[in-house]
């Protein structure tokens, strides 16, 4: 399903009441490159709540650790990808790790870490955008401009960040 909030579109797939896949908030012209489906005109309250939380993550208005307490989700990924994403979940708001940092922890290559991150079905909720290359931003499925935007928002909000109560 795709839910529109203001000018943003957020794709989500649920199994039962658990979120198993989402997109970051995108413009109408971008969303269908990342998710098939129709825009739901009257989403269920629970689905709308999840979309609103994802939008807050995009603008760095809430910490992903808090979100993982608010949203029921399930990771359906291969074991290695899960190990990578478990490390990524621990990267603090406003901070980054390199692909190499994670690779050392798992005794693997930075390229393998990058491939695992590309499989992250829950971007923003599991903050793969916080993983960068040694001397650059690295890659991001949604484009480096969006990765840079999210990281800049997090750094700006980190100094005076007060976690707003969400629902």
UniProtKB/Swiss-Prot annotation:
Disulfide bonds: none annotated. Keywords: Cytoplasm, DNA damage, DNA repair, Methyltransferase, Transferase. GO terms for molecular function: methylated-DNA-[protein]-cysteine S-methyltransferase activity. It holds the Pfam family DNA_binding_1. The keyword DNA damage applies. GO terms for biological process: DNA alkylation repair; DNA repair; methylation. InterPro entries: MethylDNA_cys_MeTrfase_AS, MethylDNA_cys_MeTrfase_DNA-bd, MethylDNA_cys_MeTrfase_DNAb, MGMT, OGT_N, WH-like_DNA-bd_sf. It comes from the Archaea. It is found in: Cytoplasm. It catalyses: a 6-O-methyl-2'-deoxyguanosine in DNA + L-cysteinyl-[protein] = S-methyl-L-cysteinyl-[protein] + a 2'-deoxyguanosine in DNA; a 4-O-methyl-thymidine in DNA + L-cysteinyl-[protein] = a thymidine in DNA + S-methyl-L-cysteinyl-[protein]. It is an enzyme of class 2 (transferase). Its EC number is 2.1.1.63. SUPFAM superfamilies: Methylated DNA-protein cysteine methyltransferase, C-terminal domain. The keyword Ribonucleoprotein does not apply. GO terms for cellular component: cytoplasm. The active site is at 128 (nucleophile). Involved in the cellular defense against the biological effects of O6-methylguanine (O6-MeG) and O4-methylthymine (O4-MeT) in DNA. Repairs the methylated nucleobase in DNA by stoichiometrically transferring the methyl group to a cysteine residue in the enzyme. This is a suicide reaction: the enzyme is irreversibly inactivated. Belongs to the MGMT family. This enzyme catalyzes only one turnover and therefore is not strictly catalytic. According to one definition, an enzyme is a biocatalyst that acts repeatedly and over many reaction cycles. This is Methylated-DNA--protein-cysteine methyltransferase. The gene is ogt.
């Amino acid at each position: 399903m795709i839910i529109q909030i203001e000018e943003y579109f957020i794709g989500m797939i649920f199994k039962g009441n658990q979120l198993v896949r989402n997109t970051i908030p995108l413009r109408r012209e971008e969303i269908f490159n990342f998710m098939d489906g129709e825009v739901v005109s009257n989403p269920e309250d629970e689905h709308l709540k999840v979309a609103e939380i994802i939008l807050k993550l995009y603008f760095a208005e809430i910490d992903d650790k808090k979100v993982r307490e608010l949203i029921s989700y399930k990771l359906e990924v291969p074991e290695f990808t899960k190990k990578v994403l478990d490390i990524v979940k621990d990267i603090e708001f406003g901070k980054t790790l390199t692909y190499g940092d994670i690779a050392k922890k798992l005794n693997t290559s930075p390229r393998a870490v990058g491939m695992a991150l590309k499989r992250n079905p829950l971007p923003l909720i599991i903050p793969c955008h916080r993983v960068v290359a040694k001397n650059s931003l690295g890659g991001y499925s949604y484009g480096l401009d969006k990765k840079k935007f999210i990281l800049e928002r997090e750094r700006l909000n980190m100094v005076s960040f007060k976690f707003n109560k969400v629902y």
